[in-house]
Amino acid sequence: MTDSTHPTPSARPPRQPRTGTTGTGARKAGSKSGRSRAREFALQALYQHLVGGNDATAIDVFTRDLSGFHKADAAHYDALLHGCITTAQYMDELIAPQLDRKMSEISPIEHAVMWIGVYEFQHCQDVPWRVVINECIELAKEFGGTDGHKYVNGVLNGLAPQLRATEVAADKAAARG
C-alpha cells in the first residue's frame, strides 16, 4: 500500500554502458585515430628502450611486427620513437624542474609518456597543446599506474606555457573573454 502524498520514487533507468572507452576511461582501440595508435606503439617502444636499453632499430623491428601496427600512423610513430630517443637527454632536462622527485624514481611508463608530450609540444605544431596533454593522459591511464595520469598532466601543464607560449597565452586570453 502506498501513501498518495508520498509517491514512490521512480526507479532510475539502467545505466547505459559508455561506448568507446575501457574500464579506466581510456578510449577503446576501435575508436582510436592512427596518430593515437602511433603514440601507443611509440610508448611501448620507448618503454623497451628505457627498461631494457635496447637499440632503437631493434625495438622498431619488433614493434612493427605487433598486432594492429598497420592501423597506426607509421610516420608519426617513427618521429616519436626516433625523435624521443635522439633528444632524450634534452627532454629530461626540460622535464626535471617540473618533478617533485628524482627522474630515476619516475615510472618508465610515465617517463616515456612525458617524452612523447614534450616531443609533440616541440615538433608537432599541428597538434594543439591541449590535445597533446589529453592524448598523454589517455596513454598514462591505459598503461600507467593508478594516478600516473595526474602526474603526467601536472608536468605537461607546467611545460606547455614554456614550450607552446604563444598558443597557451592565446587560449588563456580567449577563455577570459
Curated annotation (Swiss-Prot):
Disulfide bonds: none annotated. Residues 17-28 have a biased composition (Low complexity). One of its GO terms (cellular component) is cytosol. One of its GO terms (biological process) is DNA-templated transcription termination. InterPro entries: NusB-like_sf, NusB_fam, NusB_RsmB_TIM44. Keywords: RNA-binding, Transcription, Transcription antitermination, Transcription regulation. SUPFAM superfamilies: NusB-like. Involved in transcription antitermination. Required for transcription of ribosomal RNA (rRNA) genes. Binds specifically to the boxA antiterminator sequence of the ribosomal RNA (rrn) operons. This is Transcription antitermination protein NusB. It comes from Acidovorax sp. (strain JS42). The gene is nusB.
